[in-house]
Structures are given as structure tokens and as C-alpha cells.
């Protein structure tokens, strides 16, 4: 494996130190990018009583507002960019739901500003970007996780039923 590939793979090795989030209050979450993939994030967050969506950003004027209205999420502040959202809010985390080619910048910016990140897959589109994101995560001490949990996928449920049946 190359040195770069080793560095990326080391990201997926558990750290000895466990990172913690204060769960004594509702977690304040921002949504960056309000396209179709953000729908699954919103629907999941709405099921969590200890999570509050407080802000959303999208480059297309009015898109974030329409998105939140569609899902009945009220009291959200809207921003035209991820930088303005992160600079103006006290957040526990953000969901980065932008185009695949635009994952790196908001992820690194959030981490550098002390915000945990749930990054939609794919992680990045190049190895160099992946290394930059991994370095930012390690330097920040914040949590970065990738949103790929297919446990509710119909195919996965069928596979689980088959496995469980013996």
C-alpha cells in the first residue's frame, strides 16, 4: 500500500481515545445542502427527541426554506453558504449533504471550527481529498462519520431474514 493509502486506512482504525458529545441537552444540528439525500437525514433527525435542527444552508436561494417547510421543520435559520451557517450558529454537528464533488470544503471547514460532521457518502472523490479530510478530523479532535448505514434498505432486511432463518 502507498503511504497515502496507509494514512487513509489508518482513519478507519479505532482510536484509543473515545470522543464524547454532551448528551445532557438537545443536540443542535445544521444541514448543509438540501437536495434529495438530505431527506433521509431530516426524516431520521425528526425521529430523535434529543436532536434539534437549527439551521440549513443551500446555494440555491429559497431551496433550504422550501425543503424545511416540506418536512414540517420550523424555527430553522437559513444561510446561503456553509461558511455563514457555521460562523453564525452554535452547532453540535452538521450533516454534509452536498454534491459528491463538494464534500471536502464544508467538511474541513466544520471540523476546523469545532463542529462534528456526519458526511454523506462518498467520503470524497479523490484520495488527496480524503487525506485532507482525515488530517482535518485528526487535528480537530471532533467526530467525523460517514452516512452509510443500509440497515433499513429492503435488500438488507431480506438478507437479514435469510441469515436469521438459518
Predicted segments, located by residue:
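Structural signature of beta-strand start/N-cap positions in the alpha/beta core
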Residues: 28, 52-55, 90-93, 116, ...
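Beta-loop-alpha module in the N-terminal Rossmann-like domain of NAD(P)-dependent dehydrogenases
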Residues: 76-136
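A contiguous active-site-proximal alpha/beta segment in oxidoreductase catalytic domains
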Residues: 124-166
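Acidic-histidine catalytic/liganding microenvironments
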Residues: 48, 88-89, 153
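N-terminal Rossmann-like dinucleotide-binding module
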Residues: 2-73
